[in-house]
Amino acid sequence: MTKRLQARRLDGIDQNLWVEFGKLTKEYDVVNLGQGFPDFSPPDFATQAFQQATSGNFMLNQYTRAFGYPPLTNVLASFFGKLLGQEMDPLTNVLVTVGAYGALFTRFQALVDEGDEVIIMEPAFDCYEPMTMMAGGCPVFVTLKPSPAPKGKLGASNDWQLDPAELASKFTPRTKILVLNTPNNPLGKVFSRMELELVANLCQQHDVVCISDEVYQWLVYDGHQHVSIASLPGMWDRTLTIGSAGKSFSATGWKVGWVMGPDNIMKHLRTVHQNSIFHCPTQAQAAVAQCFEREQQHFGQPSSYFLQLPQAMELNRDHMIRSLQSVGLKLWISQGSYFLIADISDFKSKMPDLPGAEDEPYDRRFAKWMIKNMGLVGIPVSTFFSRPHQKDFDHYIRFCFVKDKATLQAMDERLRKWKELQP
């Protein structure tokens, strides 16, 4: 065809690191510590709930309410209403989506107009920018910057800090949305109450909606506490909070997510949802409903999966830190999420001429070198930064530690071989 095929909204967002790295992982014998998914089974109660949903009530094979299976929206409203200090209506304050990804896309499409500005704190989950652009918005970036670690000690993810003055300077009359992600992907940073209060005050001062991506809210470590910004004074009325069943119950393939917020905003999301996705798989929603009903009974007790999972993953994190240190990687201690990041600055000075395109960030070339030569997959952190800042942050690699023990043992074996090759 001679006519232009692709819509202009796709300009500049057609290149995707995940496609390229996914292909590389198939070509080489690797231990995949790159993508954020568990390679262990969900808890027994979750798999049993899914089995029951697929083999029990035959009507679960049919459509349910478009905006969410009623038992699921009921339990989400009850469970999170207590945490947020809100009386939530399951019909108007909760929308079930195809994963948290679907919730994000629906919100950008519902709220962002041509020329609207969206503040994104980077490093950021890499779909925020293209989703903003597809909706016609203009991404505006605020960069978290690391404080140097004390000599002889590891840095912590919470050492990556916002500059309050820089953040305040990004708000303009065109600012429509601020995107918050806590715990943060890729850093593992858990935003403190003081940081959230700063963000909340600015959102209220400038009449801005906060999109709060909290899919890792149960995965916090070392006694840190996740705080939902919607629970702060004055923020419920301007916050949309995103959650994920996949991250909550270690079942990322179920693709059930949700968004919660005030009806005057949610009604616009429902309009997008009913004219795009329309409906999410009933059986998966039924399984998630059972999982939350079970968790509601055990919440705060040792039998709670939301306590058991972070306890187990904290041990995984510590294992990975020790192992990666053995080959000279400098680690930042993750305080939340699936991930931690490693500083590869020393390798950049020792191995500056790795193969790759001239304008390709160093961490991307290093990650490919690891795949091809060491059989380890990590994700270059520069991909989570806006293009103008990628060269400034091209010396970090993200690793996922939410993996099975066998995977961590396979990682150890690759690292032993790596260490043997070092001079």
UniProtKB/Swiss-Prot annotation:
Pathway(s) the chain acts in: Amino-acid degradation; L-kynurenine degradation; kynurenate from L-kynurenine: step 1/2
Gene3D superfamilies linked to this entry: Aspartate Aminotransferase, domain 1, Type I PLP-dependent aspartate aminotransferase-like (Major domain)
Expression by tissue: Detected in kidney.
Keywords, comma-separated and alphabetical: Aminotransferase, Cytoplasm, Lyase, Mitochondrion, Pyridoxal phosphate, Transferase, Transit peptide
Cofactor: pyridoxal 5'-phosphate
Lineage top rank: taxon: Eukaryota
A molecular function GO annotation: cysteine-S-conjugate beta-lyase activity
Residues that coordinate or bind substrate: G36, N185, R398
Cited CDD domains: AAT_like
Pfam families given in the database record: Aminotran_1_2
Record-listed N6-(pyridoxal phosphate)lysine modification sites: K247
Catalyzed chemical reaction(s): L-kynurenine + 2-oxoglutarate = kynurenate + L-glutamate + H2O; 3-phenylpyruvate + L-glutamine = 2-oxoglutaramate + L-phenylalanine; an S-substituted L-cysteine + H2O = a thiol + pyruvate + NH4(+)
InterPro entries hit by this protein: Aminotransferase_I/II_large, Kynurenine-oxoglutarate_AT, PyrdxlP-dep_Trfase, PyrdxlP-dep_Trfase_major, PyrdxlP-dep_Trfase_small
EC numbers: 2.6.1.7, 4.4.1.13, 2.6.1.64
Activity regulation comment: Inhibited by aminooxyacetate (in vitro).
Gene Ontology terms describing biological process: biosynthetic process; kynurenine metabolic process; L-kynurenine catabolic process; L-kynurenine metabolic process; pyruvate metabolic process; response to bacterium
pH dependence per the entry: Optimum pH is 9-9.5.
Residues found modified as N6-succinyllysine: K82
Listed GO CC annotations: cytoplasm; cytosol; mitochondrial matrix; mitochondrion
Complexes and interactors: Homodimer.
Function comment: Catalyzes the irreversible transamination of the L-tryptophan metabolite L-kynurenine to form kynurenic acid (KA), an intermediate in the tryptophan catabolic pathway which is also a broad spectrum antagonist of the three ionotropic excitatory amino acid receptors among others. Metabolizes the cysteine conjugates of certain halogenated alkenes and alkanes to form reactive metabolites. Catalyzes the beta-elimination of S-conjugates and Se-conjugates of L-(seleno)cysteine, resulting in the cleavage of the C-S or C-Se bond.
PANTHER family, per the entry: FI04487P (PTHR43807), KYNURENINE--OXOGLUTARATE TRANSAMINASE 1 (PTHR43807:SF14)
Family: Belongs to the class-I pyridoxal-phosphate-dependent aminotransferase family.
Protein name: Kynurenine--oxoglutarate transaminase 1
